[in-house]
Amino acid sequence: METERYSIIFSSSTGNTKELADTIYEVLSKEKCDYFGVSKEEPQSDKVYIGFWTNQGNADKETLELLKKLKNKKIFLFGTAGFGGSQEYFQKVLGQIKENIDSSNTIIGEYMCQGKMPQSVRERYVKMKEQPNHMPNLDMMIKNFDRALSHPDRNDLDKLRKMVVE
């Protein structure tokens, strides 16, 4: 059976999603790759790996705009979220994203993991904590930030490798 041609298109604000994209590219046959990188154009490949970073519980704007254009594609979604550690949260994000995908497409896989955030985010949380009437969950948000510093890690990338099939 001949392997389908594919494209890997991603948006990466901090480098986390690019790391996932690089991992997918390592697993798949290079000869079958039509495109690898950032793009707003609809790919010619029938199979498309679409990478995103999470913004307020959904994919980034550029990725959502691209997904809305796709028709009759086999789509593998992959992404990162600074707020992570919960499969329930990841499923909620993926559910939001799928609402932007035309029903003519087929989702062939999906993967999300936590990703590190810029240090400025932690600094903002610490500053907010200095306020007398700060949000009660700031300690949890700071712990989450610290937990995210090592992600995506080797375990995250190994899980992704196992999910990617040609």
Kindly give the residue locations of the regions a language model identified.
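Short acidic low-complexity segments
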Residues: 33-45
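FMN-binding flavodoxin-like domain, especially the glycine-rich phosphate-binding loop
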Residues: 3-4, 27-31, 47-51, 55-166
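N-terminal beta1-alpha1 ligand-phosphate binding loop
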Residues: 2-27
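Intrinsically disordered, low-complexity regions enriched in small/polar residues
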Residues: 8, 12, 37-38, 91, ...
